[in-house]
């Protein structure tokens, strides 16, 4: 389990290069900067952030806001012409890269959790909550914490209970919730 480890921009570049995802590395001068936040939401950007430019509806104003809030670099499928030069990492497929980056950033939390996935067209949330109830009763009998759940209804990760807004969380949120569950001893 252990405390979360943070990595440098160079570590992320090397990871993407090793996976064959890197198109271009334009992070001169920021290679040793430690990344402590990974997000695609400009409102969540702050100091030491690697900002992910993703989606068909992505606007350059999001990147500008992230940089104003402290993002040290961005990752994208293309470069953006900003007023100031911002280090960037260019990748072939931003969605694939985002999942690899999130897994790395959150230190692969799933490796230390028991994870069950439920698929199908009907009854996934119902099945998940039945399963959670059974597991929680068992855990309570052992004097242990209740289980986490990620569903289309809500998400409980030991740290917070929030309403779910989409059926499947993005890779960054998914790994964050798994990390929270791990850190909370679930």
At which residue positions do the language-model features occur?
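N-terminal leader/targeting and accessory segments in enzymes
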Residues: 1-100
């Amino acid at each position: 389990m252990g405390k979360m480890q943070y990595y440098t921009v160079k570590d992320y570049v090397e990871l993407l290069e090793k996976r064959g995802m890197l198109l271009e590395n334009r992070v001169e001068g920021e290679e040793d900067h430690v990344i402590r936040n990974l997000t695609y939401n400009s409102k969540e950007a702050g100091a030491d952030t690697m900002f992910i430019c993703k989606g068909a509806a992505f606007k350059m104003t999001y990147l500008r806001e992230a940089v104003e809030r402290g993002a040290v670099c961005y990752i994208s499928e293309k470069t953006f012409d900003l007023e100031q030069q911002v280090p960037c990492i260019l990748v072939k497929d931003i969605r694939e890269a985002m999942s690899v980056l999130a897994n790395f950033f959150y230190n692969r939390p799933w490796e230390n959790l028991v994870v069950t996935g439920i698929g199908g067209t009907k009854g996934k949330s119902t099945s998940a909550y039945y399963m959670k109830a059974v597991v929680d009763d068992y855990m309570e009998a052992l004097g242990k914490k209740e289980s986490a759940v990620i569903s289309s209804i809500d998400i409980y990760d030991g740290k917070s209970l929030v309403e779910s807004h989409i059926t499947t969380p993005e890779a960054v949120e998914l790994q964050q919730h798994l990390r929270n569950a791990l850190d909370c001893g679930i």
